[in-house]
UniProtKB/Swiss-Prot annotation:
Range of residues in the leader sequence: none
GO CC annotations on file: plasma membrane
This protein's UniProt keywords: Cell membrane, Membrane, Transmembrane, Transmembrane helix
Listed Pfam families: DUF2614
Name the record gives this protein: UPF0295 protein BC_0520
Cysteine pairs bridged by disulfides in the record: none
Keyword check for Cell membrane: yes
Membrane topology: Multi-pass membrane protein
Keyword Transmembrane: yes
Compartments, record wording: Cell membrane
TM spans (from-to): 12-32, 43-63
InterPro entries from the UniProt entry: UPF0295
């Protein structure tokens, strides 16, 4: 049984996309409280704030994505972006590292923490 690795940028984009749908769902719940304007407005505003939060997250990951290192994945030969010391390919989820000390070691995201000493 192998562990499924995922690219950090894709994880953050998935979180932002889920915020959009959660926000729309929360705002839609407000429709069921049309008789009570306060509750309806509260649901609509919370849903709207979730959609705005997703916009902020998308903007942040877009800015972060422009600063990442682009490499060619050795498995699928497609360009991918790397955040941190270890990451996974965006296309084939192959574990990747640019740190020579980590080559050949088992993939672990703890290598990206500043408190980790190799």
């Amino acid at each position: 049984m192998s562990i499924k690795y995922s690219n950090k940028i894709n994880k953050i984009r998935t979180f932002a996309l889920s915020l959009v749908f959660i926000g729309l769902f929360i705002a839609y719940l407000g429709v069921f409280f049309r008789e009570n304007i306060i509750i309806m407005t509260t649901f609509m505003m919370v849903g709207f704030l979730a959609v705005i939060a997703s916009t902020v997250v998308y903007f942040w990951i877009g800015m972060l994505s422009t600063k990442t290192i682009q490499i060619i994945c050795p498995s699928c030969d497609k360009p991918t972006k790397m955040l941190g010391r270890v990451d996974a390919c965006m296309h084939c989820n192959q574990p990747l590292t640019l740190d020579r000390d980590l080559e050949g070691k088992e993939f672990d995201e703890k290598y990206n923490k500043k408190s980790y000493k190799s």
